[in-house]
Amino acid sequence: MNILIKKSIPNFITLSNLFLGFTSIILLSLSLYKDSYISTACYLILISCGLDTIDGKIARKLNISSEFGKEIDSLADLVSFCIVPSLLLFIHYIKVIPSEENNFILLILLSSFPLILGAIRLAKYNALREMRESQKYLGLPTPANAILVCSMILFVHNIPFRMFVNDSIFYQFLSTIFLDYQWMILNVAIVSSIL
């Protein structure tokens, strides 16, 4: 395999993660006009999580880890797993809570928790070289938090799924939590960002 192509594979995967994060931001902006874009943005972030899992593994397996790769990975993580979940929370609540009940400043502040705390976590991870090399995480990794936020939003927005499981006790329990208590998703997202 050509050495240039070999060295490009992990970075291409990481840049694909970044591209999907950017595409999710665009879709979330468009979701103000069409609901289905919210679900599509969530699915793209779930794919980004898979890409984030394999890019580092491939780099280590091919023995081509680089400082550039580590830095671009953190940037992609910031976009896909910090900015997108915060924007996702904000847009979700703009859509489900009547505008006369929305306190935009409070909503912006609370929705920013995944972004701010995720950025702090990524900066700490990059600053502590020995922690990065041991591959131990402190707290909940940003991709896991993004999966949690996307899963909750998908549950609320995925009507076809609800048609098949409406009678199950599990669905009734989750719908009580997430549909009847609209602020529960934001509360869970904030707590998981703090972890």
Task: Give the ranges of each region predicted by the language model.
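Interhelical loop and helix-boundary elements at the membrane-water interface
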Residues: 1-18, 59-78, 123-144
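C-terminal membrane-associated helical module and adjoining short loops/tails
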Residues: 1-2, 134-195
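Topogenic membrane-insertion module of multi-pass membrane proteins
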Residues: 1-53
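Multi-pass membrane catalytic core of lipid/isoprenoid biosynthesis enzymes
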Residues: 12-13, 61-122
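Hydrophobic alpha-helical transmembrane segments of polytopic
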Residues: 13-16, 41-48, 110-113, 117, ...
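Alpha-helical transmembrane segments of polytopic integral membrane proteins
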Residues: 22-25, 47, 85, 116-119, ...
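Membrane-interfacial alpha-helical segments at the cytosolic side of multi-pass membrane proteins
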Residues: 22-29, 82-92, 148-155
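Transmembrane alpha-helical segments that form the membrane-embedded catalytic/substrate-channel core
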Residues: 52, 115-127, 187-195
